[in-house]
Design a protein with these regions (language model features):
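Aromatic-rich peripheral "rim/lid" segments of glycoside hydrolase catalytic domains that contact
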Residues: 102-105, 151, 156, 161, ...
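Extracellular cell-wall/glycan-interacting regions and their flexible linkers
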Residues: 14-17, 355-357
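Boundary/entry segment of secreted carbohydrate-active catalytic domains
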Residues: 16-52
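Noncatalytic carbohydrate-binding groove/subsite architecture in carbohydrate-active enzymes
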Residues: 22, 33, 37, 124-153, ...
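Secretory targeting and sorting signals
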Residues: 1-16
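Extracytoplasmic/secreted cell-surface and envelope-processing proteins
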Residues: 34-35, 56-60, 94-98, 164-167, ...
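Substrate-binding cleft and catalytic face of glycoside hydrolase catalytic domains
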Residues: 42-211, 227
Length: 357
């Protein structure tokens, strides 16, 4: 009873105490203008959205970027006062071929980051072009003078790079350090004050014998890479756990590693956390009411410790349910909204924190 009272008290005052961008969501599948309008009404602070290198940079021709789809997201988000956190991810087929990976498009090559100097330079150039377009004073804002100018100031580099599901042929700390350094160089060449955020680290990566690395081990090894601390400003965590105790312990452990390396100024970004409303056997399936209860207690914990742990964002996975293209056993029902956008009890709990409708 005491825990529930604390959670309710935290949610009642959250919108007055936290920065507007603190509470976020992660879309899975297509993101429409109606989705973003709903986010705006609900006072969603941040949408973490994939910035797909593989789709935007289709050929080796210089600066032949296809920005239209991402332009539409950024434009509607600006209208609705929703911040965008781009998660730069995936590899174009022409870069994969240059790297010697020739699997079909969308296969393992798409999640096999470049390792050669030429591939890393293409990656650096892509990130620089993205910041030049969407950052402060960017081309996008010049081309759209009637939009509220909301430049993107933080950029996330890859997703769950400690998991073979997202990093082929297997997770490698030194390879990721090179990827991160190239991205950071491109971003800061265009916006020296931009924040560079690590890809979200998952506690126990799956992948059979594929060589996943525990999230805490990956972060420790990353800090051991010479000069790498200058390349990033934020550490992202995906603290999935059936129990809230497990979620809390993951965040505390990651924070302790950051503090041990003298990087207390680096923020902790929860770029994915969530439970599902499904009823299957997976431990993250909690049913509709259980999902809402987990959100309420988790968000209350993050809100109460925001300043002490320097938590910059807590983003719920996912925004809306999906059908047929979920990336995990429980993900299809992880949304705050059903597939047809019907709100779940978890969405109502989310609104208690944001003060939205």
């Amino acid at each position: 009873m005491a825990t529930a009272a604390i959670a309710l008290a935290a949610s009642a005052t959250a919108s007055a105490q936290t920065p507007p961008e603190f509470y976020g969501v992660v879309p899975q599948g297509e993101l429409t203008d109606k989705d973003i309008e709903r986010m705006g009404a609900g006072r969603v602070g941040t949408a973490r959205v994939t910035l797909p290198w593989s789709q935007i940079d289709p050929t080796a021709l210089p600066r032949d970027y296809l920005w239209q789809d991402f332009d539409e997201i950024v434009a509607e988000a600006a209208r609705q006062d929703v911040a965008i956190l781009p998660m730069a991810f995936s590899v174009p087929p022409w870069v994969s071929a240059m790297e010697g990976c020739r699997k079909p498009p969308g296969g393992p090559c798409e999640v096999r980051p470049p390792q050669t100097q030429a591939g890393l330079e293409a990656w650096r150039s892509f990130l620089a072009a993205a910041v030049d377009r969407y950052g402060p004073g960017g081309v996008f804002w010049t081309l759209n003078p009637t939009l509220p100018e909301r430049p993107i100031r933080a950029w996330q580099i890859w997703n769950e790079q400690n998991s073979p599901g997202f990093y082929q042929p297997r997770p490698d700390v030194s390879d990721y350090a090179a990827l991160l350094s190239a991205a950071s160089a491109g971003i800061r060449a265009e916006d020296p004050e931009a924040e560079v955020v690590l890809g979200g680290l998952y506690r126990f990566p799956l992948g059979g014998d594929g060589g996943g690395i525990r999230g805490t081990d990956f972060l420790e090894r990353l800090y051991a890479q010479p000069g790498i601390e200058a390349a990033f400003d934020g550490v992202a965590v995906h603290p999935y756990s059936a129990r809230l105790l497990g979620m809390r312990s993951q965040v505390r452990r990651m924070t302790s590693i950051v503090d041990a390396h003298g990087d207390g100024q680096e923020g902790i970004w929860i770029t994915e956390v969530g439970w599902a409303s499904g009823g299957g056997p997976h431990p993250l399936n909690r049913g509709p009411e259980g999902q809402a209860e987990r959100l309420r207690r988790a968000f209350a914990w993050f809100t109460a410790r925001r300043a002490a742990l320097n938590i910059r964002l807590v983003a719920w996975y996912a925004w809306r349910d999906t059908k047929g293209d979920a990336v995990c056993d429980w993900c299809a029902n992880s949304g705050l909204l059903e597939f047809d956008s019907t709100p779940k009890p978890a969405w109502l709990e989310f609104l208690r924190f944001t003060g939205g409708r």
